[in-house]
A protein has these predicted regions:
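Short basic (Lys/Arg) and small-residue
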Residues: 1-19, 26, 35-37, 41-230
Length: 230
């Protein structure tokens, strides 16, 4: 398992050897024995330099959250999945997980260049390290897909998930809006399939930041009018 790498050390090593490092396995990827991990593009690399390079890559048996945001999301989603299992049936816990996922996704949604590759450059702006990285849509899908599937028949879950996505659509960078809208479309399809012939279909279509029982959403102009009337 590629657990972590020394970003600053890798850039310094590559600059010192006038090289470009291309990682074939990202942080969080399982690395099978004998699998190439990194390509070194340089005119000449001494053997001692290779040993130093390997010392900047942490391989182990478990993923870690320090450089692997997807694993942090995975842990939260697993908690929600267990809560939504037939044996537990605890949609409130799943809704609380969505609260924390919302916070994480809002932070990611304001982060530029979540486009599949991380480029680390030296002080002169020369690209020195290229690493596979998650796209925003990958992380969003990881955060919501399984909860949507396992919580498809829970009004509390689908309402909280709708609120999460609608809020996120307003907060993310323009280049990520399409990914959020795609997840909203998937949620619509899920609700139609799960609640199409049920009496609670209308409730399932309402966004609620608390899942069930939350206050209605108000816009600033509505608040001003209400204040003036009082």
């Amino acid at each position: 398992m590629n657990e972590a790498v020394d970003h600053a050390g890798l850039v310094a090593w590559a600059e010192r050897h006038d090289a470009v490092l291309v990682f074939l396995q990202g942080v969080g990827d399982f690395v099978s024995a004998g699998t190439p991990l990194v390509e070194v593009h340089a005119a000449d690399t001494p053997a001692s330099g290779e040993n130093e390079l390997l010392g900047m890559i942490a391989l182990g048996v478990e993923r870690t959250i320090e450089q692997d945001v997807a694993f942090a999301i995975r842990i939260m989603v697993d908690i929600a999945n267990k809560a939504l299992s037939a044996a537990v049936n605890d949609p409130t816990t799943a809704t609380q997980v969505l609260n924390h996922l919302s916070d994480t996704l809002h932070s990611l949604g304001r982060t530029r260049h979540l486009d599949g590759v991380t480029v680390l450059a030296d002080a002169r702006g020369q690209a020195r390290v290229l690493m596979p990285a998650h796209r925003f849509e990958d992380l969003l899908s990881l955060a919501v897909t399984e909860i949507r599937e396992y919580g498809a028949r829970s009004i509390q879950v689908v309402r909280r998930l709708r609120a999460l996505l609608e809020d996120l659509r307003q907060a993310v960078l323009p280049e990520y809006v399409g990914a959020v809208e795609a997840e909203l479309a998937r949620l619509e399809a899920t609700v139609a399939e799960s609640f199409g012939d049920r009496i609670d279909l209308d409730l399932a279509h309402v966004a609620d930041r608390q899942g069930i029982g939350g206050p209605p959403r108000l816009h600033s102009r509505v608040l001003v009018r209400e204040a003036e009337r009082r």
